[in-house]
Amino acid sequence: MHSWKKKLVVSQLALACTLAITSQANATTYDTWTYYDNPTTALDWNNMDAAGTVDGNYVNYSGFVYYNNANGDFDQTFNGDTVNGTISTYYLNHDYNDATSNELNISNSVIHGSITSMLPIGYYDRFDTLDHDGYSEYYRFNNGTDTVDGNWYDGDVFTLNIANSTIDDDYEAFYFTDSYKDGDVTKYTNETFDVSEGVAVNLDVESNINISNNSRVAGIALSQGNTYNNTYTTESHNWDNNINVFDSTVTSGSDYILDSAYTTDTGTFGTGHFGNSDEPSDYTGAGDVALSFTDDNGASDYAMKNNVYFSNSTLMGDVKFTSNWNANFDADGDDTNGDGVPDTNHGWADDGLNVDELNLTLDNGSKWVGQATYTVDTTSRMYDVETNSLTPGATLEDNAWNRIVGNEVFQSGVFNVTLNNGSEWDTVGDSTVDTLAVNNGSQVNVSNSDLTSDTIDLTNGSSLNIGEGGYVDTDHLTIDSYSTVGLTESTGWSTYSNLYANTITVTNGGVLDVNVGQFDTEVFSTDKLELTSGNTADHNGNVVSGVFNIHSSDYVLNADLVNDRTWDTTQANYGYGTIAMNSDGHLTINGNGDINNGDELDNSSVDNVVAATGNYKVRIDNATGAGSVADYKGNELIYVNDVNTDATFSAANKADLGAYTYQAKQEGNTVVLEQMELTDYANMALSIPSANTNIWNLEQDTVGTRLTNARHGLADNGGAWVSYFGGNFNGDNGTINYDQDVNGIMVGVDTKVDGNNAKWIVGAAAGFAKGDLSDRTGQVDQDSQSAYIYSSARFANNIFVDGNLSYSHFNNDLSANMSDGTYVDGNTSSDAWGFGLKLGYDLKLGDAGYVTPYGSVSGLFQSGDDYQLSNDMKVDGQSYDSMRYELGVDAGYTFTYSEDQALTPYFKLAYVYDDSNNDADVNGDSIDNGVEGSAVRVGLGTQFSFTKNFSAYTDANYLGGGDVDQDWSANVGVKYTW
């Protein structure tokens, strides 16, 4: 029986095992409990007949395991068998012979019932419902012989191997019918003999239990049994238990009969649902035990060491640990020298030998759902032993003052839990352990339950998730190496903090994630939040810091914010902690007060208490296209409620907020948002009108080249022409910045008209171009279509006037990435009207050369539509006007090879002034996106006439010095003259 089901009275009945069980060589079904019925007399439970009695009425047990099975029960191997009832290894375990194997192997079998190392027991009045005498009535069974040796031998460990088998604790009672004569009438009584053990495996011997290959065991209880050995004197020993579970499941068992509804007459606790009764393995919540470890042997001098390992397995149920002082340990202390002051706790010199242990490890994706509980003896009167645990309460002075002096204690037992490699623990009820280590992507989920541990350590991407109704208490919480502790609105805190720790350390990429509402202070409580980073030497010179993330919370930290890091990169302790938040978040750091319960509001020069110390980066996590400058610029992010703070804060990143990027900036004991440059998407949106103008300017140059070439070389009577144009631009007006590539084609047709005072060329052209606009992550794909009418008048005195009118339509598809990685896109279109006018004089140099001074003016007037990007940035439709003024000179020479062939190279030099003073309205703010300034144009070109009617031409230009530099442009075309 478990320690939680105390026996009140013991009645022994030695029964001979008279029913022989056949060989276990073949798969067989066995029943360990049977009933011998005398049909003439009724069963008298209080005076049950002895086994083998002629004409008796008795329950018979045949389930003992022996090393050398000569008694007709079981040997040490079950393979493919089914057993109904209780298997007892009592005689196997107590045969202390070095030559015998203390091992039981169960494979490919089903045990409907339990295994025990004790003598089997059965209750006929477990709940005292028959005679109400205050006792539970039961019988204990043996084989009528004594054990070989009553001593305990340390190291003679019982090994139980369970492979591909089920032990379901589902034989909780032996049901039988007793018949008897009442006169000449045969009557029947239905009897229940309660043989439930509470779990499937119940052992009070040192044990190694190996469970593997998809096995299922409904609970294990290990207790420290007899440790007496008359040959042991002063040497130390340990009682060692090991449980290893691979690819299998351990569930809770059952203390009571479940296959009938509860009645006060029988004391059964089963329930029914659609015709099915509860099963022992049905975990119903806190109190339903799957693993139990009990050292309540008050006569033992030896500690009980329990190691439990689960790999790729499931544990469904509570884990219970009970520990008491060894018999040779004095918790109050002993005065050995008679001076009236205790000086020793006795026990073993090695403190570890005085302490029971339960070490539970979940590995390789194992999962545990259940409660961890322990009952241990504690003392704070430590004379020659060292602290091995902390109390969630307090230790007091051992005097009349009775003041709180700490939390350190010495316990009779410690319970440690470790999760490795993606394992999981979902806590239930009120769990208490000494240490909790969560490693390598594992997780602990605490909802509608409590978890208390002296220390909690999370490493390598692990997580502690505190959900609704979850509470976690610890002395020291360490969040290390990209692990996370999460607290959200759904946590549901009220009067008490859902997370309490005297110290919280966040480092090496760990995250304390607090995503709550406004003006919150109670979601977690701590005296000290250590937000720091690992040594750069351990991270190849990089800083990997811990993160305190408050999202959009308006959070008040009533704790000291500390680290020992400096901003000085030359120092060995260079590093920082990171405070992360959204732009609408706010952190107030109040500190936790000084030793006299003062606070950091004392700003005098003698105040030695600071609310924050160390070096920190402030990271803005959110990004949005919405909001004006007034919504962000100068907003307070952090307020340290202590002007004497020596903490340093600097920007960890830039965040895209509205049209601009912002970063954190320290101003005294506050940190505010500092406005920086345009965001990538805003930069692209504001650069589009200028980029449209660049395309149009290239088209202007293309039309101008056509008209210039008509005045030089062989005679030109008008014709048809086609020209490629392209170029690269770099724009920078101090606000916008971009790089642009353009490629396009123009086709035109014109004719020569002789006027009274001038010779005219009149024509029309169409242009098609694509542009690629970019800067950092910003990208714009441009399409334009243009229509031109143009003319040129050349007078007899060699003065000429060129002019054109144009209509253009521009389509622009914008995309970019925001600072948080979010993809942004949008599109806009605009219509534009333009003109060009050029006045010049062709000065002839002999028959073939010329120099042409000229002046020109051109203008483009765009009208765009209102549009909004996918991140909610709004751009009002902009009327964007651009004027260009140019003074220059062309010079060339025509080499004539025949009357049909000629080559005319030429050179161009000009001064250009762009006047484009424009502002755009973005999110309600006016932003300068005009480009202007003086520039110099340098160009080279040539025209070659292959025949009288067919010629080709090319030129290249550079223009630089203004807000927009044209790194290069090219114009390559052919024409056919009439």
Swiss-Prot record:
Question: Per the database record, which ranges form the Autotransporter domain?
Answer: 713-978
Residues annotated as signal peptide: 1-27
Highest rank taxon of the organism: Bacteria
Concerning InterPro entries, the annotation shows: Autotransporte_beta, Autotransporte_beta_dom_sf, Autotransporter_adhesion, Autotransporter_pectin_lyase_C, OM_autotransptr_brl_dom, Pectin_lyase_fold/virulence, Pertactin_virulence_factor
Entry keyword set: Signal
What CDD domains does the database record attribute to this sequence? Answer: PL_Passenger_AT
A single cellular component GO annotation: outer membrane
Gene3D superfamilies, A to Z: 2.160.20.20, Autotransporter beta-domain (2.40.128.130)
Cross-referenced PANTHER family, in alphabetical order? C-TERMINAL REGION OF AIDA-LIKE PROTEIN, PTHR35037:SF2
List the protein's name: Uncharacterized protein YaiT
Native species: Salmonella typhimurium (strain LT2 / SGSC1412 / ATCC 700720)
